[in-house]
């Protein structure tokens, strides 16, 4: 299990270092020191996303930040983030965030950016349950009260 988490962490580090390049499963499997099939399987198991979806969401989130903060053209951002074409980038952006990149750059609406959860190398320790106490909760209904608020004293 520790070996799997370490491999997923190495893949996440590789992705973050090479996010503006084209990343394939062969490069990720080399970083993980596993076969491409097994690297994809453990990545999906620990992150809940396939490597392709993880990379696409990370690229789109970084491009959304660049559109919001910098005055770059959509074409430049699409090329720098490694999308094959501007049309493909615009379709992926709309599918991910629900708006066009041009509309977003002109008036940024709040969007859910993808923030990856990094796999930590620490292992959870099992807690000793011998020193625990049970807590009983009881709902008590009280009558409504009137409140008088005095302002401007």
What does each model-found stretch correspond to?
Residues 37-39, 43, 88-89, 93:
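Short hydrophobic/aromatic patch on the recognition helix
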Residues 1-6, 53:
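Basic, helix-initiating cap at the start of DNA-binding domains
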């Amino acid at each position: 299990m520790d070996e799997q988490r370490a491999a997923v962490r190495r893949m996440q580090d590789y992705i973050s270092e090479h996010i503006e390049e084209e990343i394939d499963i062969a490069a990720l499997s080399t970083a993980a020191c596993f076969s491409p099939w097994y690297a994809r399987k453990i990545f999906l198991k620990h992150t809940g996303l396939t490597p392709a979806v993880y990379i696409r969401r990370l690229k789109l989130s970084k491009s959304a930040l660049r559109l919001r903060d910098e005055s770059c053209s959509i074409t430049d951002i699409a090329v720098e983030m490694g999308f094959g074409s501007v049309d493909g980038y615009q379709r992926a952006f709309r599918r991910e965030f629900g708006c066009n990149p041009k509309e977003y750059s002109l008036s940024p609406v709040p969007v859910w950016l993808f923030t990856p959860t990094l796999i930590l190398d620490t292992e959870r320790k099992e807690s000793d349950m011998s020193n625990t106490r049970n807590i009983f909760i009881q709902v008590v209904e009280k009558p409504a009260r009137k409140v008088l608020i005095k302002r401007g004293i």
